[in-house]
Amino acid sequence: MIGRLNHVAIAVPNALKAAEIYRACGAEVSAAVPLPEHGVITVFVTLPNTKIEFIEPLGDASPIAKFVEKNADGGIHHVCYEVEDILAAREQLKASGARVLGDGEPKIGAHGKPVLFFHPKDFSGALVEIEQV
């Protein structure tokens, strides 16, 4: 059911600044993209085997604003795995006891594909995102 690692998200106060070290190492770095519906600005770093997503709060009401406030230098926020069928994956994970965050319905994520998040307490302290590919 769960496929490959799509990305690791790191919450930071300034996404473009955080990505610069990767650009200096030769990685491909995207432009900053505001996602008002998610309350974040994203910058993706493409690596040979996965991506790093830097997420920056977009306004004080951002869902990651408190995380960045507590972790002023930034920190790992979530990991994202690919799935073929997000609804089937949701049902299988729920049947195993995992709790879906939000209203339980997929939202369109940063890649324009459906995503869901699952409670960190059900994944050994890691916030998990699944993305339909």
Question: Which residue ranges define each predicted feature?
Answer:
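Interaction-mediating elements
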Residues: 2, 21, 28, 32, ...
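Vicinal oxygen chelate
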Residues: 4-13, 34, 43-53, 65-133
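A cross-kingdom feature marking solvent-exposed beta-strand/loop segments within repeated
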Residues: 5-6, 25, 30-39, 59-71, ...
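Short loop/beta submotifs within extracellular cysteine-rich repeat domains
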Residues: 17-20, 28, 52, 62-63, ...
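Conserved active-site tyrosine of GNAT-family acetyltransferases
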Residues: 18-23, 93
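Short, charged/polar surface micro-motifs in flexible loops or helix N-caps
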Residues: 48-52, 59-61, 86
